[in-house]
Regions:
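Surface-exposed coil loops of outer-membrane beta-barrel proteins
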Residues: 1-66, 75-82, 174-186, 238
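Outer-membrane beta-barrel pore domains
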Residues: 74-241
Length: 241
């Protein structure tokens, strides 16, 4: 997310790569020529300290990356969560697989991502049947530098869907709070189909370490009680060191 093109991560990325969690665990990574590998084993306990118990549940991660050439990389990422009924669980799904393509040229680039997974059931802490079932999603994010290393134009389209009425969810900002038809209950941003379009400009003050981001986003969610649409205008300052 350090070189993110949009003001906020996509809803499906927030779901699969749960924001804010720092699980206790172990990682083993290796690089051989154009290939890189990662294996991870984590406790699902919510305690972020190293002395977290290992009697709650386990999450298993596997990542495989291939650098096709200087501009193009492919990445596959898989996570399986075996937490059971009554056990702590930091991931809100049973398993998820993502496939990602990253292409970076001189002044432009594009990232394409595909996701598929299972929301889980009572064993994973998902007690409501309408929030269980399978989900799938696609996100495409092209960008172009109008001024090299200074002014960036970005676009993102994301689509997600589920077999259940509330199997996918939008980001927390801002459709859940304000949408076109206030008589329709947005259901916490949950539904069975979601489209989102984003267009923005980023002004890089110090590469991606400090940048000003502006954008407009349109969301279309098929919630349990009806269709919900909304437009969000973004102005953000993002920094990392």
């Amino acid at each position: 997310s350090k070189k993110i093109v949009t003001a906020e991560r996509s809803g499906v990325s927030n779901k699969v790569y749960v924001d804010g969690i720092r699980p206790t665990g172990f990682k083993l990574s290796a690089i051989k020529q154009d290939w890189d590998f990662l294996l991870g084993l984590y406790s699902t306990e919510e305690n972020p300290e190293f002395d977290a118990k290992w009697d709650q549940g386990l999450a298993y991660q596997g990542t495989l990356g291939y650098q096709m050439n200087d501009e193009h990389k492919l990445v596959a990422d898989f996570l399986y969560n075996d937490s059971g009924v009554g056990q702590e669980n930091q991931w809100t799904y049973e398993w998820a697989l993502s496939l990602r393509s990253e292409y970076v040229a001189d002044r432009w680039g594009v990232m394409t991502e595909g996701f598929v997974g299972d929301n889980g059931d009572e064993a994973n802490g998902v007690t409501k049947a309408e929030r269980q079932g399978h989900f799938w999603a696609a996100v495409i994010t092209p960008y172009y530098y109008i001024i090299p290393d200074r002014l960036q134009l970005g676009f993102q389209y994301q689509y997600s869907a589920s077999t259940r009425d509330e199997g996918v969810r939008t980001s927390s900002r801002y459709l859940r709070r304000n949408h076109a038809d206030p008589t329709v209950d947005v259901g916490g941003g949950r539904g069975n189909e979601h489209h989102s379009y984003y267009l923005g400009l980023n002004y890089l003050l110090c590469d991606h370490n400090a940048k000003i981001m502006t954008g407009i986003q349109y969301d279309d969610l098929n919630a349990e009680e009806g269709k919900v649409t909304g437009t969000t205008y973004w102005f953000a300052y993002r920094t990392f060191f």
